[in-house]
């Protein structure tokens, strides 16, 4: 099954669900989805720390939003590929937000007789399906040097 549309998770003032405990009964989130972002820093970090890159570029958020970890990973792959083909190791690129917020889905059945099999909105906490980074307006998302 594919991803739900972004408007299902478009709340700007959302309560972050991150409670994970070693004791399963005390944890709000029973299963944590795996992290899709493989690397957060790419390129030549040593040259960046020495201060040899004269220009810096930062992508900022226009509004409060949730950014899914798979969309951050897709942007990371695209930007890193473009930088690698254009500058070949003479750059430094960093993904700044870390997806902590665990997104949930209360699956609903459709079709004949489905009302007898599901509970509706009783016990509607949902199962975890992905992670997201809660980003505030003006926060940095990507950094390129």
Which residues make up each language-model segment?
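Ribosome-associated RNA-binding proteins
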Residues: 1-145
């Amino acid at each position: 099954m594919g991803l739900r549309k972004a408007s299902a998770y478009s709340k700007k003032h959302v309560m972050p669900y991150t409670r994970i405990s070693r004791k399963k009964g005390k944890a709000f989130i029973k299963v944590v989805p795996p992290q899709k972002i493989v690397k957060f820093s790419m390129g030549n970090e040593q040259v960046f720390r020495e201060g040899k890159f004269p220009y810096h570029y930062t992508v900022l958020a226009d509004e409060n939003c949730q950014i899914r970890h798979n969309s951050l990973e897709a942007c990371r792959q695209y930007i890193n590929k473009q930088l690698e083909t254009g500058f070949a190791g003479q750059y430094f690129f960093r993904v700044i937000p870390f997806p902590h917020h665990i997104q949930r889905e209360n699956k609903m059945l459709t079709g004949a007789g489905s009302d007898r099999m599901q509970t509706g909105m009783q016990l509607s906490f949902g199962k975890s399906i992905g992670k997201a980074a809660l980003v505030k307006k003006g926060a940095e998302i990507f950094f390129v040097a």
